[in-house]
Amino acid sequence: MKTWVVYDSVFGNTGQIARAIGNALGSQEDVEIVRVSDVKPEQLTGLTLLIVGSPTRQFRPTGAITSLLKSIPKDGLRGVKVAAFDTRFTVSEIEKVRILAFFVRIFGYAAKPMADRLEKKGGELVLPPEGFYVGDTEGPLLEGELERAADWAKQVIATQ
């Protein structure tokens, strides 16, 4: 099973989650954890599983993740199982700032549009998009999030 976990990270939090996911998949053969800046769309062909992660920046994925996903040819992920995750604030933190809560209700987080784009490119979504929580803009990850990421990865494996 050839699996890639592709991520972007601004302050390191999404990278930590990506590594926790990749390490949980580690008993699987051929697991690669790759920063988006090191990925070309043609490298994604022939994968069994592709997991993509991004911090939520202005209610969407980073520009680098968006560019990569847009550059994948139509049906370029046909036959590939896919999943998406993001890092974000907790709902209780968002609710403290009324305007932020309003925008989140309208625009959401990064994981859903990534999952939608992966499906548009022919991928088969194996689990709903997932969010992992940070305590502030620069982090840190909240306690237990790395373990939750590893558990989520095990759920992904169970779909194979």
Residue ranges of each PLM-predicted region?
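FMN-binding flavodoxin-like domain, especially the glycine-rich phosphate-binding loop
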Residues: Q16, A24-V34, G46-Q160
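Short acidic active-site motifs
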Residues: D38-Q43
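N-terminal beta1-alpha1 ligand-phosphate binding loop
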Residues: K2-Q28
